[in-house]
């Protein structure tokens, strides 16, 4: 079950049209995990021998039966696609068996999705012991106008690429299972490295503006039954 605040959706859409009037056609990007797909159960069920590092070849072949489409995002994707805009997907998963993910998305979204055509794989780079996003490189190459994602790294990548970032609200059950990369890590409360807690998160939500100044897409998706 979900709620969409149509007035906010229309306002956001109109702002984007006026901001990017070139030909009336936008290049719109979407993250996959916790943005298009509620894929928590896939990652929780990764076999122990495929967890360190994560075997994305296994992950990409197991969305069917485990991942759930986040319906408000699907409706948003359909809005852009049906109005003639270019819809593209960029994930931090690696591309091994990426064709399986493309097939799964094609069946669920009802339009053709192909690896390296409108679905791109952009794994993080490990530098000095920390993972860093590489999505901005693909965003820049694709000349994206907008990018929708749930993670802090998605917002940072969009800003680096010159695209307008829009935060998708992460489901609470995903936050409880995996706190990092979402407004820092609110599960730890306020710390030097993570200055926000759940109270702060609700403040961001109510203002529809995130920690980097990004728009927050006003949806609440209750998650799996």
Q: Which residues are covered by each model-predicted region?
A:
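Bacterial N-terminal signal peptides that target proteins for export
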Residues: 2-9
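A periodicity- and composition-biased signal for non-globular, repetitive helical segments
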Residues: 12-13, 141
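Hydrophobic h-region of N-terminal signal peptides that target proteins for export
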Residues: 13-21
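Alpha-helical transmembrane segments and their juxtamembrane interfaces
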Residues: 16-17, 45, 160
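Flexible, charged surface loops at secondary-structure boundaries
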Residues: 20-24, 81-82, 139-143, 159
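Alpha-helical substrate-recognition element adjacent to the catalytic core
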Residues: 26-126
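C-terminal cap/substrate-recognition subdomain and adjoining C-terminal extension
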Residues: 94-225
């Amino acid at each position: 079950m979900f709620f969409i605040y149509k007035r906010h959706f229309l306002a956001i859409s109109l702002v984007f049209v006026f901001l990017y009037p070139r030909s009336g056609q936008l290049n719109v990007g979407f993250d996959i995990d916790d943005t298009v797909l509620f894929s928590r159960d896939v990652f929780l069920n990764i076999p122990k021998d495929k967890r360190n590092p994560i075997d994305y070849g296994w992950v990409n072949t197991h969305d069917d039966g485990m991942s759930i489409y986040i319906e408000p995002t699907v409706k948003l994707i359909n809005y852009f696609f049906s109005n003639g805009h270019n819809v593209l997907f960029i994930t931090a998963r690696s591309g091994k068996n990426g064709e399986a993910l493309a097939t799964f998305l094609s069946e669920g979204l009802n339009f053709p999705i192909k690896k390296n055509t409108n679905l791109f794989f952009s794994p993080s780079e490990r530098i000095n012991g920390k993972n860093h996003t590489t999505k901005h490189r693909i965003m820049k190459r694709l000349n994206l106008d907008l990018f929708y994602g749930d993670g802090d790294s998605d917002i940072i990548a969009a800003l680096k690429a010159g695209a307008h970032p829009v935060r998708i609200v992460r489901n609470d059950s995903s936050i409880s299972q995996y706190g990092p990369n979402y407004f820092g890590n609110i599960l730890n409360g306020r710390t030097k490295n993570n200055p926000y807690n759940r109270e702060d998160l609700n403040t961001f939500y109510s203002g529809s503006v995130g920690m980097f100044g990004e728009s927050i897409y006003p949806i609440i998706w209750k998650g799996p039954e």
